[in-house]
């Protein structure tokens, strides 16, 4: 907006009008800070993704949300909209472990819609979990992956983590209200077995505090934990038991006798501190197994998949092989820009943060296994699954925690005193895939020939498991279902396959989502317009009064601000049928309404020059790695 004063009546009038203009603009910005700094869903829209397959880009959003203003703590998310809708909207929140390992592992190597063919080419993942669920990947705690926080402001305890995650969800649903009514499932693996139950409990507590209709109760429908670090008291002693079962160590050998000494020390430490989540003396069992079973070429077992070998002392830290492509891809400047990474995130992406892992010791937190009975009894279904070739968070420990846990009037998988729920054989497309076991709201699935990262090895089978847990039945949708059977009995249809597809239910849901989006945009747009109109009115009044005083003065404004003005076009863009997020509007039209804040700019940060913590691949032996720690 430009004001000129071609009249020769003097500079006083020009100066006065300029002052009035600045005063009006200041008033406008004072009462409408959202025009300067607040973001909308459109700011998070991913308009392109380098290396994506040909064809329409999947609808996705990504970026940072502040969860700790005092320490500049921001969590990064990457969200994908589902490809099909069976009978209702569902959202799966995915978390990787560590603590301090990025959920981009899950996004690009496990359950996300894309996998990397090489370090610059994406291809579709036929087992992606986005078939019937929206996917929300979050790098957490602060400092993990693309998330960031001020130096030395990492968090330490599980309740701190869950509080920040609730803050994240509150703000995320404000940006994307169309998803707030979804059925919500929280899923993840490894050390996320500690995070997920705490987040679930925090959601329940948040829902219980709602006293009015201004807030929406979140529909938590279940939690899913794969190869989880849930009960250290059962998981630590399982290392040696698993090593015997898999033939890594021969029972009764001299090595076995030495390891049993470490086992005895560990068990005494557990007895002294039954609620400890990290016990260094117990970690020594795993380190000794890896060190003393290496061959003459210094090849040790891969702790995440004992079918594989790795160079000592890495012992699995170089796995999965996809990491060689994932890291350079996520450090590319064009990818960083496409994912709306804040310029405040100075260092490039790393899979795992040593600083976060070493700081998050949970010394004053109870192990999450103690939260599971109450969650089950409150009606939250829980699915625990394990790949049978994982050592570090092996299925033996998971089965022991189930056998010892009491909930809903029974112990373990008891169906009645002394009677246990049977194990059912599961086949997928004619191949033995694993076993299912269920009792009193808890489901356990053991996958055959699978590692610590089950969806990495068996993507379609893992999605079939998820769809059954979410009670998806696509019989009325169409498409080719998978042949999945329990004890030979064909199960409800859960897979249609292919990218992408459309259904009547999907179209209805899209219309509902679009309606909700426009309501949210209109609400924020109307508030902004009110302030703009007030400012323009005040400015116009002073111009009119100045003209009356100084008839020789003429205000020249090069563009009409009447009914065809930018303000009107802005309103039309907010309320019309166009897709705001997809970029159908001309963003330059907004330049006259707000000043771009620093978060509106995107810079490349894809280098390693200023890392927040140690690399995921340390030079030190694995003894520096926590069980369930520094891992996917």
From Swiss-Prot:
Q: Where is this region: Disordered?
A: 480-507, 568-632
What residues sit in the active site?
Answer: 190, 390, 452
Q: Where is the signal peptide?
A: 1-38
Q: Which reaction equations make up its catalytic activity?
A: Preferential release of a C-terminal arginine or lysine residue
Q: Which GO terms describe its cellular component?
A: membrane; trans-Golgi network
- Where are stretches of biased composition, namely Acidic residues? 581-590
Membrane topology qualifier = Single-pass type I membrane protein
* Role noted for this protein: Protease with a carboxypeptidase B-like function involved in the C-terminal processing of the lysine and arginine residues from protein precursors. Promotes cell fusion and is involved in the programmed cell death.
Q: Which PANTHER family match?
A: PHEROMONE-PROCESSING CARBOXYPEPTIDASE KEX1, SERINE PROTEASE FAMILY S10 SERINE CARBOXYPEPTIDASE
| Record's protein name | Pheromone-processing carboxypeptidase kex1
Gene transcribed to yield this protein? kex1
């Amino acid at each position: 907006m430009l004001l000129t004063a071609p009249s020769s009546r003097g500079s006083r009038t020009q100066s006065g009008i300029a002052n009035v203009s600045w005063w009006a603009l200041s008033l406008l910005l004072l009462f409408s800070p959202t025009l300067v700094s607040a973001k909308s869903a459109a700011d998070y829209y991913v308009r392109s993704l380098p290396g994506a397959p040909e064809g329409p880009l999947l609808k996705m959003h990504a970026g940072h949300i502040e969860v700790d203003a005092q320490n500049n703590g921001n969590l990064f998310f990457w969200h994908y909209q589902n490809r099909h809708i069976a009978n209702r909207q569902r959202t799966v929140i995915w978390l990787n472990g560590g603590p301090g390992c990025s959920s981009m592992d899950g996004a690009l190597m496990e359950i996300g819609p894309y996998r990397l063919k090489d370090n610059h080419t994406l291809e579709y993942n036929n087992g992606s979990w986005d078939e019937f669920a929206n996917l929300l990947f979050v790098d957490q705690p602060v400092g993990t992956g693309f998330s960031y926080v001020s130096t030395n402001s990492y968090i330490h305890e599980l309740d701190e983590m869950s509080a920040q995650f609730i803050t994240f969800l509150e703000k995320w649903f404000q940006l994307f209200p169309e998803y707030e009514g979804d059925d919500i499932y929280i899923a993840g693996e490894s050390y996320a077995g500690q995070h997920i139950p705490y987040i679930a409990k925090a959601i329940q507590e948040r829902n219980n505090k709602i006293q009015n209709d201004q807030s929406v109760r979140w529909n938590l429908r279940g939690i899913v934990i794969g190869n989880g670090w849930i009960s250290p008291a059962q998981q630590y002693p399982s290392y040696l038991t698993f090593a015997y079962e898999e033939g890594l160590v021969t029972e009764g050998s001299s090595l076995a006798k030495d390891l049993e000494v470490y086992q005895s020390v560990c068990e005494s430490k557990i007895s002294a501190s039954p609620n400890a989540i990290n016990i260094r003396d117990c970690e020594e069992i795993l380190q000794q197994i890896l060190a003393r079973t290496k061959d003459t070429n210094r090849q040790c077992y891969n702790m995440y998949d004992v079918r594989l070998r790795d160079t000592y002392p890495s012992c699995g830290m170089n796995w999965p092989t996809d990491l060689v492509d994932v890291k350079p891809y996520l450090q590319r400047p064009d990818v960083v820009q496409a994912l709306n990474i804040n310029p405040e995130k100075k260092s490039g992406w790393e899979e795992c943060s040593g600083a976060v892992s070493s700081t998050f010791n949970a010394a004053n937190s109870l192990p999450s296994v103690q939260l599971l009975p109450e969650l089950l009894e409150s009606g939250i279904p829980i699915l625990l699954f394990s790949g049978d070739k994982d050592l570090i968070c092996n299925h033996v420990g998971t089965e022991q925690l189930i056998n010892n846990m009491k909930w809903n009037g029974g112990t373990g998988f008891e169906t009645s005193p002394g009677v246990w729920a049977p194990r059912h054989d599961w086949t997928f497309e004619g191949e033995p895939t694993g076993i299912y076991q269920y009792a009193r709201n808890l489901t356990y699935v053991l996958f055959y020939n699978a590692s610590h990262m089950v969806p990495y090895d068996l993507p379609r089978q893992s999605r079939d498991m998820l769809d059954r847990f979410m009670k998806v039945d696509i019989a009325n949708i169409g498409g080719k279902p998978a042949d999945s059977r329990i004890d030979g009995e064909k199960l409800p249809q859960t897979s249609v396959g292919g990218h992408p597809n459309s259904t009547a239910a999907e179209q209805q849901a899209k219309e509902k989502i679009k309606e909700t989006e426009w309501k949210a945009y209109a609400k924020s747009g109307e508030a902004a317009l009110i302030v703009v109109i007030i400012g323009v009115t005040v400015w116009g009044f002073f111009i009119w009064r100045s003209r009356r005083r100084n008839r020789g003065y003429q205000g020249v404004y090069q563009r009409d601000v009447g009914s065809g003005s930018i303000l009107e076009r802005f309103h039309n863009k907010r309320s019309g049928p166009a897709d705001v997020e997809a970029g159908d509007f001309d963003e330059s039209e907004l330049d006259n309404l707000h000043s771009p804040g620093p978060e509106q700019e995107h810079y490349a940060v894809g280098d390693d020059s200023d890392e927040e913590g140690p690399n995921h691949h340390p030079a030190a032996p694995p003894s520096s790695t926590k069980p369930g720690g520094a891992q996917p």
